[in-house]
């Protein structure tokens, strides 16, 4: 696990997909911040989906007591979401490499109708 600093002074842990999957099994919530189109094409089952553009307005929907792991396609947008949420007091990590790394690790993801997912 690596960390990155940001302007808020909060260090954001950078997690590999396998570590994110393990933490998810232990109660952490995966937060997908990609676009609707990306999410429909392929997503991890049972994630919380809030686009990056909606994070500030919808942060109140998240439980600050449950650790979050933000993810996007490659890791940039989720890093921005993680920084924003950390500044609001959430415990949040970023999944390094995003859905591209999740797919490369051979981990499962699906389309909105339950079929095999695609990272776009």
Predicted regions and their residues:
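Short, surface-exposed ligand- or partner-binding patches at beta-edge/loop junctions that are enriched
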Residues: 71
């Amino acid at each position: 696990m690596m960390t990155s600093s940001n302007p808020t002074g909060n260090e954001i842990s950078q997690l590999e997909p396998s570590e994110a999957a393990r933490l998810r099994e232990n109660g952490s919530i995966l937060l997908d911040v990609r676009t609707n189109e990306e999410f429909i094409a392929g997503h991890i089952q049972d994630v919380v989906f809030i686009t990056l553009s909606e994070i500030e307005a919808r942060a109140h929907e998240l439980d600050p007591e449950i650790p979050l792991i933000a993810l996007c396609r490659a890791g940039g947008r989720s890093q921005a979401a993680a920084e924003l949420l950390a500044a609001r007091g959430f415990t949040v990590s970023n999944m390094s490499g995003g859905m591209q790394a999740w797919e490369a690790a051979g981990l499962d993801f699906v389309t909105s109708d339950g079929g095999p997912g695609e990272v776009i």
